[in-house]
Amino acid sequence: MADILKSVKRIVVKVGSSILVDNQEIAAHRIEALCQFIADLQTKYEVILVTSGAVAAGYTKKEMDKSYVPNKQALASMGQPLLMHMYYTELQKHGILCAQMLLAAYDLDSRKRTINAHNTIEVLISHKVIPIINENDATALEELVFGDNDRLSALVAHHFKANLLVILSDIDGYYTENPRTSTNATIRSVVHELSPDDLVAEATPNNRFATGGIVTKLQAAQFLLERGGKMYLSSGFHLEKARQFLLGGSHEIGTLFYSRVSS
């Protein structure tokens, strides 16, 4: 598996809401661990972070009915600066600056807007600044309702020339069966292709604030597979496995998606 990483120069790390918030509180210890991990990754790779969690972070300060979309957008508006403050504070401990970029999927549908965003990313990375991208939840709807930024992270990886998308989630890999209902379920180590049925199964997000599930992660993987890209799905609760793979080249757990052609 170490050979897969030889050509990897730039990675997108996407972290889900369920990692960032725990029991209606921002999980400061996980953000601290994540920022330590990002600092370590930056010694080997160019790193772009795609974060979820703005709605969940906002809810920790003001409870609202999230089934009403304007409330959800208001929560995102409150939560985003909370997240950025924590990222900024923790990354500063490692001498790293970060920058906020709020995007929507339609920003990447426009060639002009994509080029503008790409140019900004390149300048930030050239100065060792970590771009932190989130969906512009205050105005966008699609990812806010369903996706938890999984699809956005795949678009970011593709359009901003990353060699690998790393999704850190409460789902620690792509299982042969549902691990919550089957004791025989095992994690697939490598996946080269996905079937149409894999991409339309019912999504069952584990966290009340998460809007995705395994299906949106598989859809992100499929998007990249079709374009010769790679994706690695691993636990965001226990970063040592992702660390072993990305920094040590040892693939013990988690699922790596790549086409045989791209390998």
Swiss-Prot record:
Pathway: Amino-acid biosynthesis; L-proline biosynthesis; L-glutamate 5-semialdehyde from L-glutamate: step 1/2. Pfam families: AA_kinase (PF00696). Substrate binds at S52, D137, N149. GO terms for molecular function: ATP binding; glutamate 5-kinase activity; identical protein binding. The keyword Glycoprotein does not apply. The keyword ATP-binding applies. It catalyses: L-glutamate + ATP = L-glutamyl 5-phosphate + ADP. Keywords: Amino-acid biosynthesis, ATP-binding, Kinase, Magnesium, Nucleotide-binding, Proline biosynthesis, Transferase. Inhibited by L-proline as part of a negative feedback loop. Also inhibited by L-proline analogs 3,4-dehydro-L-proline, L-azetidine-2-carboxylic acid and L-4-thiazolidine carboxylic acid. One of its GO terms (cellular component) is cytosol. GO terms for biological process: L-proline biosynthetic process. Signal peptide: none annotated. Its EC number is 2.7.2.11. InterPro entries: AceGlu_kinase-like_sf (IPR036393), Asp/Glu/Uridylate_kinase (IPR001048), G5K_ProB (IPR041739), Glu/AcGlu_kinase (IPR001057), Glu_5kinase (IPR011529), Glu_5kinase/COase_Synthase (IPR005715), Glutamate_5-kinase_CS (IPR019797). NCBIfam families: proB. HAMAP family: ProB. Catalyzes the transfer of a phosphate group to glutamate to form L-glutamate 5-phosphate. May be important for growth and survival. Belongs to the glutamate 5-kinase family. This is Glutamate 5-kinase. It comes from Leishmania donovani. The lineage of its organism: Eukaryota, Discoba, Euglenozoa, Kinetoplastea, Metakinetoplastina. The gene is G5K.
